[in-house]
Amino acid sequence: MVALKTQGYWTRNWLIWLILSILLIVFIVQSINIHSIQTQKGSIIEKAGSQALRQVSEKAIRGDILDRNGEILATSLLRAKINIDPTILQKEFISDLAKALEFSETEFKDLMDSQLSKKRGRRYWIIKDDISLNSQMIGDIESLITDRRKVCAEMIVDKKLKLHHRILSKIGVQEYPNEKIKVNRCTKQKLAGVKIEKYTQRYYPRGASLAPLIGRLNSDGDGIAGIEQEFNDLLKGKDGEKEISTSSDSGSYFNPKVVTKKQNGKNIQLTIDANIQFMAYDAIKNSVKRHDADSGSAIILSPNGEILSMANYPADNPNDKSTYIPENYKNRILTDLLEPGSTMKPFTMLLALDQGKITATEDECFDVTKRIGHVIPTYNDKKIYKCMTVKKILQKSDNLGTVNVMEKLDKETVYETWSNLGFGKSLALIPSIETPGVLKLPYEWSNADKRTASFGYGPMNTNLAQLARAYLVFGNEGSMPRLKLFQNFNKFDEDNVKVFKRETVSNIANHLKAVVENGSGYRAKMRGHEVAGKTGTVDVRLASGGYSKKGNVNTYFSGFSPVENPKYFMSINLNKPKKCFRGYTNKPFKCEGSNSAAIAFNEAMNKILNNGNYDLQLAGN
């Protein structure tokens, strides 16, 4: 009985120890699992912490600039650049990535090695830029970025302990040192180290021909010249803001919430005709080069004051971002002040005829042999011209004859008329760059001022746009409309300013036709088209107040076509032309409006009138 009891005792004792051991093992395993779960939970919490809310800017798209027919003159193109970080680029993608980027695999690897050898403060560098979003390259790169591939890498990790070793290590029975081993680990991965950065790029389809008028942007996307600068806020719009949740691991974002809605920029439509603009630009460019002038400008108007062209040369191509010369973005038609010279003589005749001081007929002749003040006879041989009619005075552009007419007028009336023609007043087209010129008050005029005012010197100066506008009286029965540059804003409903009688402008217009047919403006004459206009030549005024004695001049031609019911008005200025010729010969001659600016007028107007594609739809017509 005792033996049996002893045997049963040890059996039970062994069973108890076995059960306790099993419970201990279960406890240890559960402890390990709990620790693992806590570790994973900590990782999840850490990842959740890395997913943060942040606000990002949503760029507004800049508005377009259009011509009168809707042709785009300035627009923002969606472009892309591809950035690469060679430190994390997987070798499994290199072959296809090189192909997508249009490199050979060897070229691409050499580029990567070159970048890796450089000590750089930034990880990513631009490998391709200025790419269309619709290009094959962008499509191929986007496919690679979303593709998952098997990527294997040799890694050194801790050798995994067996379960009973882990248990014994946990309960402190025996320590097992960490052993490092090499393993080849493979995972499915997306392409790393490649980013597509999208942006907008301003594009000017007509290049340099419109640059001084349209302007350009700086690297921050703000206008730094022309209309781009003047109306920067209107064109730029307002950026929006979105609140997004981001993951610091992948950089991905989700659940975007609009905080501030973006407002894209407004479009601006001009009265400019892009084709007429190009013809005027081409003509003025040719003239500047032909006559070795410092610069040249041309403005073309419709009868109702719409500006069809504002051309300046030299001018740069705004699509070329490598250079920026501010002088080549200068809209001289509005910025440069000039003394208009003999282009003012028609207005002296208009005023005198309108006031009944002259008849402007063939039997009315003015003495051009006697000096008046500081104005001396042009022709020393008195047998050539003892007197001149109004037509002859305009044809020969005679200063003394014009002064004879001005002597019949009082300076208050002259001032009032010049003011009604817009001289000395802002055109309010692009206010920040316009220099409106000066018209002195009549009490400041001396007798000499009044005389020189008759031929565009003395108490006044102006810009080319104001001069061109004054000639609109010949297309509006003596009235003068406001100039218009914008189709979709800055509308003015005011009546035209009445300056002269209808009969007066018709009479003098025919005399200006004679100037082109048989006078100083003969180089503006065109086969098949009637032209009327007036030349001008002015000594360059120095900053000191005097005039250049080196023969430097500014030359002009202002005119219109046809003579009855004119369709186009154009004013031309060449600044300091140095290479001119006598008549139609190759003999060098001093530069005048007749042998420089009149030629530019002819070239531009000929192209426009003979193109045959223009039937202008004028505002209000």
Predicted regions and their residues:
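Membrane-proximal periplasmic segments of bacterial cell-envelope enzymes
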Residues: 1-233, 315, 423-424
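Short, Φ-rich (hydrophobic/aromatic) sequence segments
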Residues: 61, 209, 221, 226-250, ...
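Envelope-exposed proteins and targeting segments
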Residues: 61-62, 78-82, 123, 192, ...
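Beta-lactam-recognizing serine transpeptidase/beta-lactamase-like catalytic domain environment
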Residues: 72-74, 246-259, 296-342, 347-584, ...
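Solvent-exposed, polar/charged alpha-helical surfaces in well-ordered, non-transmembrane soluble domains
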Residues: 80, 91-95, 99, 135, ...
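Conserved, well-ordered alpha-helix/loop/beta-strand core segments that scaffold catalytic motifs
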Residues: 252-296
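Short, gly/Ser/Thr-rich active-site loops of penicillin-recognizing serine hydrolases
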Residues: 492, 591-621
